[in-house]
């Protein structure tokens, strides 16, 4: 099986573009590829899914233990003909000023070769020096080959012998610049895949260009690895509860692994749209409001008053509810849109969502629960991630958040039927799915007893 990591010296080098082009080309060649993303990013896996038509999965060595990451990789890679892991940021850049949770640490943990994506603009010999530095920064860099991005054929033919001589690494090919295939960006990075109407056409152009300019035989020889050791499938529970999951253009940041863990714990997931549907699905015993871009759809969310009222009444009535980041903002009193206009929201929580215009409390952190609640025990610790340009006038105080070994802030609302806060939680390898489903089961029993 071909297995490798796509990495680059820095952000903005075109990793996602190259990854999507490679996935499409591999699929075209009948390789049945699957994809992973290093780190907590939600958007890149959406692009992978658009190419493959199957789920892409996150592997994060800050949010998860190494054994959990290895098990997730083996589980989701099983049965595929090729595995492509897209790195995040620069190759060695991880949490803070360390390599923790970097693309390099993932390659090292999984013992995978790395294809280094390099943009050659404005450099030649210096490019070789930079690559040498990356190769020798760690005793085992895992860098196996080089791919030039945004590169002309003429420049490729000039640089290939130079780079191979100076670095000892094969230059496997190049992806030329295609102005007609550029994907625009937005405040969380790239636009989501569902918002780009001509995405399939753009990726098709990129795949054709890469397929024509890549040394496939060498790539296969460098990246062929034994299939990951199989892991026993998780034992499926039969809790018999339905959990409603918000899923639309406003709420699109849910880890596929989280949803799978909820199913394994016994939940039947029922998807709905707070933008378009008028009420919650029937006979639900739990509600999951993930993150996304509610600030960009504040008006239609607000104008859907029947849905806002249904969610407010359900949450206030004790329906077990988890609301992360954008879902947390939706439960507030009002939410400002991009122009600063405040729109009424569900009104469950006291805070108002406000536009800040910069990243707020960005990055990895550690969160400690102050009291027992739906998802947590008092004193329990969980690794989290935050990434948002909006804030709330009341972020709650149910948790202490640690960053760089210091208490930085308090956040979150927690009760025996609620978790709501800005932090994104990674559920795989934790007791959270089981506890959420257990809370839903308890709610179901209470509801039946009331009706009896």
Predicted regions and their residues:
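A short, charged/proline- and glycine-enriched loop
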Residues: 1-2, 236-242
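ATP-dependent carboxylate-amine ligase catalytic core
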Residues: 2-110, 118-142, 150-157
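Beta-strand->loop->alpha-helix junctions that form or flank phosphate-binding loops
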Residues: 37-38, 171-179, 268-276
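C-terminal and late-domain segments of enzyme folds
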Residues: 107, 212-213, 237-239, 251-261, ...
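Internal gly/pro-rich beta-alpha loop/helix module
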Residues: 124-235
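Cysteine-nucleophile active-site neighborhood
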Residues: 294-372
